[in-house]
């Protein structure tokens, strides 16, 4: 069964809406999905291929789908009636998949932050865990991922501890105090260019909230192995439970 003109038009408009919203999002990049299994787990991350690092909002797959979908829409409605063949129908299926991915990426972008402090880049992202939440008892669980990259060229960075404050829109505050030791039981040493990431989580009493904090680090060089202590900022990032009562 061929898709109707109304279906084509509706999906096309949704694609453009989400794509435009993503393009307005600071520090946008294609992010991997957060998984509950990452909670309490950390490790070093292999560098991405160059083409993956530079995709950003110019993701060839996404932009190609949008451009082809625009052409499909224009061709279908130029004469006032759709003329969608089998190949075009397949393209429509691709557009629907792209729409789903764009929506997921948009929510991830809205729940992320990126900060660079003294050559250390921190990207933090969160995701609502519906399967472990109970809105009826005001329990909303979120998992979050923190990715640490040492962008310095002449020194290593060791993460010694952390401090976080979790706040809900109802005013609840959950504090992880300053100098809480390590991250997921480790004090990773990052050589120049290395990346370490870990996952954790929190329960709050509302479908919306935020996280702010810092990581305690020491800068180490060949001349000074004891190093210089400093804080690496983790900029505020949102906790958002989509499609919950009062949050639509």
Predicted regions mapped to residue ranges:
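Beta-strand cores of modular interaction/reader domains in eukaryotic scaffold and signaling proteins
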Residues: 123, 147, 158, 165, ...
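Short acidic, flexible loop segments centered on an aromatic residue
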Residues: 154-174, 217
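Short, surface-exposed linear segments at secondary-structure transitions and domain or protein termini
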Residues: 168, 184-195, 238-248
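Intrinsically disordered, low-complexity Pro/Gly/Ser/Thr-rich segments with frequent PxxP/GP/PP motifs
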Residues: 173-208
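Short, solvent-exposed loop/turn segments enriched in Ser/Thr/Gly
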Residues: 139-145, 212
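Intrinsically disordered, low-complexity, basic-enriched segments
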Residues: 1-121, 127-129
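Short, solvent-exposed beta-strand/turn "edge" segments of beta-rich domains on protein surfaces
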Residues: 128-141, 152-155, 188-192, 204-206
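Terminal connector regions
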Residues: 201-248
């Amino acid at each position: 069964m061929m898709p109707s003109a109304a279906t084509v038009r509706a999906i096309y408009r949704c694609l453009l809406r989400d794509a435009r919203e993503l393009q307005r999002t600071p520090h946008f990049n294609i992010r991997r999905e957060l998984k509950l299994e990452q909670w309490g787990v950390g490790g070093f991350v292999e560098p991405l291929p160059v083409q993956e690092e530079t995709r950003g909002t110019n993701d060839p797959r996404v932009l190609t789908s949008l451009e082809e979908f625009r052409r499909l829409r224009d061709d279908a409605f130029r004469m006032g009636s759709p003329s969608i063949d089998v190949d075009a129908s397949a393209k429509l299926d691709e557009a629907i998949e792209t729409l789903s991915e764009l929506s997921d990426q948009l929510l991830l972008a809205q729940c992320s932050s990126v900060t660079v402090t003294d050559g250390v880049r921190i990207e933090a992202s969160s995701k609502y865990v519906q399967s472990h939440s109970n809105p009826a008892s005001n329990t909303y669980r979120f998992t979050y991922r923190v990715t640490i990259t040492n962008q310095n060229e002449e020194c290593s960075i060791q993460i010694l501890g952390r401090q976080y404050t979790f706040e809900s829109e109802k005013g609840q505050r959950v504090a992880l105090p300053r100098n809480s030791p390590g991250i997921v039981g480790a004090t990773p040493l990052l050589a120049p260019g290395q990346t370490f990431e870990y996952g954790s989580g929190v329960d709050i009493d509302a479908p919306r909230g935020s996280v702010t904090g810092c990581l305690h680090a020491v800068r180490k060089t060949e001349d000074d192995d004891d190093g210089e202590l400093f804080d690496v900022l983790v900029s505020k990032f949102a906790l958002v439970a989509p499609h919950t009562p009062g949050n639509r």
